[in-house]
Structures are given as C-alpha cells and as structure tokens.
C-alpha cells in the first residue's frame, strides 16, 4: 500500500490524538519483528545444542520448529512495515 504512510501523516497533522498512536504502532511492528528474529536465533542455537549434545531429540526439534515460526513472523512484520 504506497499511500499508507501519507494517510498516517495526514491523520497525524489533522488529529494528533488519533494519528500519533498510529505512528507508534507502525514503528513498533518493526521492533517486534526484530525481537522475534533475535528470539528465533536463540531458539535455533538452543535447539542445535540440544540435538548435538544430548539424546533429547524431541525437545531439540521443538526448539528448531519454534525458531522457524518466530523467525517467519519476525520477517513478515519487518517486510510488511517496509513495504
């Protein structure tokens, strides 16, 4: 949506009590996306360590799958914020 930012700026200029929370939400999506990516990296490292060191293959697999889900969500939020 190429006009989304223009609409947000217009709402902010005319009605700041409505527009300012919209701008904050727009910025927080990328912050949440980065946090999800960092958590997903931690989960994948924990999963790889569990899979390589011990015999808890189910737990390691769960950590790897969780990291893929969180990483996908983080990439989606960052992509939607920048498009």
Curated annotation (Swiss-Prot):
Transmembrane segments: 31-51, 59-79
Predominant cellular place of this UniProt entry's protein: virion
Cellular compartment(s): Virion membrane
Alphabetically ordered keywords of this record: Late protein, Membrane, Transmembrane, Transmembrane helix, Virion
GO cellular component labels: membrane; virion membrane
Induction: Expressed in the late phase of the viral replicative cycle.
Family, as annotated: Belongs to the asfivirus EP84R family.
Protein name in UniProt: Transmembrane protein EP84R
Originating species: African swine fever virus (isolate Tick/South Africa/Pretoriuskop Pr4/1996) (ASFV)
């Amino acid at each position: 949506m190429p006009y989304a930012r223009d609409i947000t700026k217009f709402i902010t200029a005319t009605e700041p009590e409505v527009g300012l929370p919209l701008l904050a939400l727009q910025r927080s999506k990328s912050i949440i996306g980065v946090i999800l990516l960092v958590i997903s990296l931690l989960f994948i490292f924990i999963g790889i360590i569990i899979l390589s060191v011990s015999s808890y293959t189910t737990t390691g697999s769960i950590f790897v799958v969780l990291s893929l889900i969180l990483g996908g969500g983080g990439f989606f939020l960052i992509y939607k914020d920048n498009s």
